[in-house]
Structures are given as structure tokens and as C-alpha cells.
Amino acid sequence: MSGCASSSPTGTLITMVTMPVSGNDAQYSKEGRASCWSVFSLVAAGNCSVEKAAKSGGVTKIKMVSRETNNFLGIVGKYTTIVQGD
């Protein structure tokens, strides 16, 4: 038996989801994003780390982390980490 696991819901044709990773619905004043790309699930590039997302938005106190996944037919994928805080 082989194992393939996905940390987010995956559609066969199109995937467009945003899911919370950690945190709460507290009020926040800043938001930062960091993205990675995938082509044919063979080549992937980018830095979608929490650290890069926080830096891009000037967030020093993280209150919420979310992940956004967009994929079309497994051909092109964009994976974005969203950090919210102050």
C-alpha cells in the first residue's frame, strides 16, 4: 500500500480553497502573504513560509495563519501562506 496524503481538500479538475492553519478570529491590523508555485507537480519553486509571509506584511505579532490552495488539473498550482496580526 502506498500513501498519498493531502492537507487540504483536493478537486480533480480545480482546487480553490482557503483553510485556517492556526490562530483565532482576533482582530488584526496587518496581513502578509507568501506564495509557492508548482507545474505538473514535477517542478516547484518559491518560499511560502510563515516567516516570509509575516515579513511581507510587516507582521511582528502573529494572530492567525491560513493557507490558500489553487490548482488547475494538476498542471499549475499556487500555494499561499497568509499571516495576520499586528
Swiss-Prot record:
UniProt xrefs under Pfam families: TRL
InterPro entries, A to Z: TRL-like
Identification of the protein by name: Protein trl
Gene that encodes the chain: trl
